[in-house]
Amino acid sequence: NALNTISCVCRENPDRARELILTLSSYYRQALENDQYMLSLHTELYHVASYLELEQARFEEKLVVELDVEDDLNCKVPSFILQPLVENAVRHGGDRTGARHVSISVHSVEGMAEISVADRGQGIPREVVLGLYTGQGKGVGLSNVHKRLKSIYGEDNGLKIETSEAGSRVWFRIPLEPEEIPVPSHEIKQEESYNEDSCD
């Protein structure tokens, strides 16, 4: 989609197309270079901003984005945990006219960082929400984020979803300034398996 958008822009606005090529290059560079499983919140938001700039060129005035981030909020987030939620809101959060309004909010709540993505679309289908919580969902993006959050922070700390015909809000909470960054449970199991094999 990004390349198709840039191709269309090339004909009408070559200078803008060059800017988008640089943005796309930056987007992929971040994806390749950020091999850590935890990133700073600001690094994660920068990656999301690159993605949104490309989508803005595609949807133009039909895409409105609001960003509300509490000042001096310091925390680590799982790498690329936010982008799938934003992408889902952009792709599926259009209203009946095709307009898309996406709100990204990050605030401290009860000693945690609450990160949410909201849209004004027509709601997430009930079967998608049920599938997410039962582990039988077909949606890859939300399901992967839900599983990653539970793997890192525990079974009770996955995605939360509020949805209606007036829009949806998907959110999660993570610790502020953790003294020790948690290791995903699947990585712990892999390390234990390796240690057991090395003792034989």
Regions found by a protein language model. Give the residues of each.
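Two-component histidine phosphotransfer core
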Residues: N1-E162, A166-W171
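C-terminal end segment of the histidine kinase catalytic
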Residues: T163-D200
